[in-house]
Design a protein with these regions (language model features):
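Start-transfer (signal-anchor) and selected internal transmembrane alpha helices
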Residues: 16-74, 163, 167-188, 294, ...
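Membrane-helix boundary/interfacial segments in multi-pass membrane proteins
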Residues: 14-18, 82-87, 111-113, 132-133, ...
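Extracytoplasmic
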Residues: 510, 520-682
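Signature aromatic-anchored transmembrane alpha helix within multi-pass, membrane-resident enzymes
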Residues: 303, 350-363, 421-428, 492-523
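Hydrophobic/aromatic-rich transmembrane helices and adjacent perimembrane loops
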Residues: 145-148, 324, 465-492
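Membrane-interface alpha helices of multi-pass inner-membrane proteins
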Residues: 248-251, 304-316
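Active-site lumenal/periplasmic loops and adjacent helix-entry segments of GT-C-fold
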Residues: 52-266, 546, 569
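Membrane-embedded, hydrophobic transmembrane alpha-helices
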Residues: 1-56, 358, 362-414, 443-451, ...
């Protein structure tokens, strides 16, 4: 998916090929042929192409993936509507790209520009839609469940392998199942579990109140676990966000950070494979020609592939580029310390050169995006607010304590047998799985601490300054912690000789599994009674039209079926996260101005947005037909939509006579009065 999808995007973005179904299929076939050729070349050179003895494992992992995919797909069918939260944006992006033969597509909420956001995640959904000849109405939901399945299987596969590598020689009898148990735990921790907020506020505190005879005031609402700091207790000057994958998968958004989960987990797994290979090769040979030596350092396949993925992250979710550049850098540095046997100058020289190599290649491959993208970042500032200690303890106490316990366990075990105590000797003594788990855990702790120190400035300064920074950093911290805990718990239970560590690990496992109750609570709250098959609604993401916009549904569906390309369809603009822009979001057809706060974030040009908002009002309410015609010409408007939202916003000021005089009515609903005017072009 990454290779064929990204290659297709590059060819379209540099205007070599159009973004059509035929191109998606053609590129995929070409990549398939190339893989077949490479396969035969490798066979001729005696290179193993299939992992010997692993086909049964691969088959089982594919079955596991399919099972998790079916589970989430079944659940999604109880609430498939792409309406609410960020869904209008996510679905609208997909519809806009389905209509477009160029990328970036025309911005559905800013018709005079193209999409100025990290649209890579929605692009991959559209790529798969065009590749398979499917419809966005269905693939919107299939993509969210597809990602959820990857979010389970990738951690499972990585942690299972790490545990098997670490317990090599100890897996006799029933212990042979431990790697799989660790993998399942990691998959659960990353994609299904909640956090300790659920345990405290859904289980423990209500039980205490019940014992005290205090009546329960409110039931537990699953988004509370993601809106805690700044909300309980209320602090209007520091509202924050700390979401995690299970919440995202239940809610059903297809936002940048969600889709990229499948790519970041792949990158983490690849980094482990690289570190394992480096350790197997042993120290770098002393005597090498300088040119050969540096070419070897710069052209390592794993580093090159990591660079391409990091570059891709700038387009799928820029925050992940920064986060995983640091993670990749940490892995490279540790690997170089071992490869060059603690020789500081050589370690620093190679690490710096490889870092430059990674940055250079990552920026090069994504130039078709960055050259057309205006950043939303306005700098970095010191955090003026900080989380309460007990809030951090509730949200992050479990993974941090287990990570610290793992680090202490690993270090104390290895330090006892070291004759020469140095960083190199210590790292050399630690096994690759232990070392990699420590790196993941330390990176995750850093991601939790950063929002307590600094934040990235954007438009959310008043009361929400830390929100976006905390959201994007701790989302990845949760993923890294999940894999660290999945590995660390079983590693300490089996290997540690200290009873207290085994006890604490067991307690940690119990608490972690307790947080899985969040999944059940969230599913019941959001999807309803999923045991009643009769309430299954299917996967059509647009069923909300008849439910929530019955007066406009038939008109919107007429546009979807009859309008080709991306002509401008004017509709009333409104605030973000409301029912406004239901036309553009459902069809992908651009309007003059859409959700205000979103375009403010993407464009950061408030005067321009206010001018467009005023012009839209003039078009709908003015009695001066000539003024209206000039505005229609300025914005190249082809159709004017008059429905429920327009009547609600403009009321008696809505001038139907002028609007209908601008062209011909191509659709009219006699029951609701909704109509569409096709503007006559002068």
């Amino acid at each position: 998916i990454a290779v064929t999808g990204f290659l297709t995007w590059i060819l379209v973005a540099v205007e070599i090929l159009p973004f059509t179904a035929a191109v998606c299929v053609g590129v995929s076939v070409a990549v398939g042929i190339l893989c077949a050729v490479l396969f035969h070349v490798q066979l001729k050179h005696g290179i193993e192409c299939y992992p010997s003895g692993k086909m049964q494992l691969i088959f089982r992992e594919e079955l596991l993936f399919f099972g998790i995919f079916l589970l989430w797909t079944y659940l999604a069918g109880f609430r498939p509507q792409a309406y609410g939260t960020e869904k209008f944006m996510d679905y609208g992006f997909m519809e806009a790209m389905m209509r477009s033969k160029t990328l970036p597509a025309r911005d559905l909420w800013y018709s005079q520009g193209t999409i100025n956001y990290y649209y890579g995640g929605q692009y991959f959904a559209v790529f798969l839609t065009k590749l398979t000849g499917s419809r966005v109405e269905v693939t919107y939901n299939l993509m969210r469940t597809f990602v959820a399945a990857f979010a389970f299987v990738y951690p499972f596969s990585l942690v299972r392998q790490m545990t098997k590598d670490r317990l090599y020689g100890r897996l006799d009898g029933k212990k042979k199942y431990i790697p799989s148990l660790a993998g399942v735990t990691a998959g659960i921790a990353v994609s299904i579990a909640g956090n300790v907020h659920y345990i405290v506020y859904r289980c423990v505190l209500p039980l205490i109140r019940k014992i005290q005879g205090v009546a329960e005031t409110a039931s537990y609402w699953f988004p509370d676990a993601t809106r805690y700091i700044g909300y309980n207790p209320v602090n209007d000057s520091d509202k924050t966000i700390h979401e995690f994958p299970c919440y995202s998968f239940v809610l059903g958004d297809l936002h940048a950070h969600v889709v990229n989960v499948m790519f970041v987990t792949f990158l983490v797994g690849m980094l482990y494979a690289w570190m394992k290979m480096i350790r197997k090769r042993g120290p770098e040979p002393e005597k090498q020609e300088r040119s050969v030596f540096w070419l070897r350092q710069l052209l390592m396949p794993h580093i090159l592939l990591a660079s391409v993925f990091l570059g891709m992250f700038q387009w799928t979710n820029y925050w992940d580029f920064v986060i995983y550049f640091v993670v990749t850098g940490g892995v490279v540095l540790i690997a170089n310390i071992i490869r060059f046997e603690g020789k500081i100058i050589r370690i620093l020289a190679v690490t710096i050169v490889q870092a430059v190599d990674i940055i250079g290649l990552s920026y090069l491959v994504i130039l078709p995006f960055t050259l057309k993208f205006d950043t939303m970042v306005q700098g970095v500032a010191l955090a003026q607010h900080h989380s309460l200690w007990y809030q951090l303890l509730i949200l992050w106490g479990l993974p941090v304590l287990l990570t610290v316990l793992l680090i202490l366990s690993v270090i104390t075990e290895k330090m006892k047998g070291l004759k020469h105590k140095s960083l190199y000797r210590l790292l050399e003594a630690i096994t690759v799985p232990d070392l990699f788990a420590v790196i993941m855990g330390l990176c995750a702790i850093g991601l939790v601490l950063i929002p307590e120190l600094v934040y990235v400035r954007d438009i959310y300064e008043n009361g929400n300054a830390r929100a976006n920074t905390m959201f994007k950093l701790t989302y990845q911290a949760y993923i890294l912690f999940g894999m660290t805990m999945g590995y660390g718990i079983y590693r300490m239970l089996v290997i540690s000789r200290q009873k207290i560590i085994r006890i604490l690990s067991g307690v940690g496992l119990f608490v972690l599994l307790w947080t899985v109750g969040y999944f059940g609570n969230a599913v019941h709250s959001w999807f309803g009674d999923v045991w009643k098959v009769s309430e299954y609604q299917g996967l059509d993401a647009t069923t909300f039209l008849e439910q929530d916009f019955p007066q406009d549904a038939s008109a919107i569906r007429w546009l979807k079926q009859n309008i080709k390309g991306s002509p401008v369809v004017l509709e009333a603009n409104g605030d973000s996260y409301t029912g406004y822009e239901r036309v553009s979001a459902s069809t992908g057809l651009p309007t003059v101005l859409g959700w205000y706060v979103h375009e403010w974030l993407w464009r950061n040009n408030v005067p321009d947005l206010n001018e467009k908002s005023a012009d839209i009002q003039t078009i709908y309410t003015s009695t001066d037909a000539e003024t209206v015609k000039k505005l229609i010409s300025r914005y190249d408007i082809s159709y004017i939509f008059v429905g429920g939202q327009e009547k609600e916003k403009y009321g008696t000021e809505l001038n139907d006579r002028v609007l209908q005089s601008l062209g011909s009515i191509v659709f009219e609903d006699d029951m609701s009065g909704t109509y569409i005017v096709k503007v006559e072009q002068d």
